[in-house]
């Protein structure tokens, strides 16, 4: 199969398991990506907990969602377990840290990469709690408004979108396809022809 050289830099878009992802950060041996669009609306936790690793959304992302990526052709061995800080937005550290293959951005991560994260016509969850259960706030989780500002919502709300984030091993880049949205018209035509040729070869 012909390899496609992908120019990877922050704000680039790649396709992984059929999911278009924005590259947020490039390190020596890994890249951080965020889903370009929401994968759908769902609760942070059906039981109304704002502690991310205990929630149904975290379990879905690291279970069924990974299976879906794999079914769509993703090399899921390239997913890197990542530890994120669950310090609440008011500074409480009750929830500690969690290590997951697929996660939501925290408020701090969102602020760090805000300039290259496009707004969506949707609200979407972050992993950070507004405060914690010990302070009387067991259910409020932070989220991003459609204009990019932040708000808080009860975790059982099913009306907010989900943008999965994850680290990939840099070595996988040779096998990834660039997102078609990244091409000029001329490049798009060449890429479509290339993919059609590859499809014909494998039939």
What are the roles of these predicted feature ranges?
Residues 1-187, 193:
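Collagenous Gly-X-Y triple-helix signature in extracellular proteins
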């Amino acid at each position: 199969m012909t390899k496609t050289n992908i120019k990877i830099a922050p704000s680039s878009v790649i396709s992984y398991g059929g999911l278009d992802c924005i590259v947020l950060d490039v390190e020596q041996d890994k890249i951080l990506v965020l889903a370009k669009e929401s994968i759908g609306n769902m609760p942070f936790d059906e039981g109304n907990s704002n502690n991310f690793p205990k929630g149904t959304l975290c379990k879905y992302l690291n279970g069924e969602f990974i299976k879906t990526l794999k079914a769509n052709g993703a090399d899921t061995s390239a997913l890197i377990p990542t530890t994120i800080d669950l310090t609440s937005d008011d500074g409480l550290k009750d929830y500690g840290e969690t290590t997951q293959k697929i996660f939501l951005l925290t408020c701090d991560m969102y602020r760090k990469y805000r300039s290259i994260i496009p707004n969506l016509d949707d609200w979407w969850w972050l992993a950070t709690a507004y405060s914690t259960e010990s302070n009387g706030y067991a259910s409020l989780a932070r989220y991003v408004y459609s204009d990019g500002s932040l708000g808080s919502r009860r975790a059982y709300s099913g009306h907010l979108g989900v943008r999965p984030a994850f680290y990939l091993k840099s070595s996988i880049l040779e096998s990834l396809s660039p997102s078609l949205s990244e091409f000029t018209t001329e490049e798009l035509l060449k890429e479509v022809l290339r993919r059609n040729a590859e499809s014909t070869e494998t039939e």
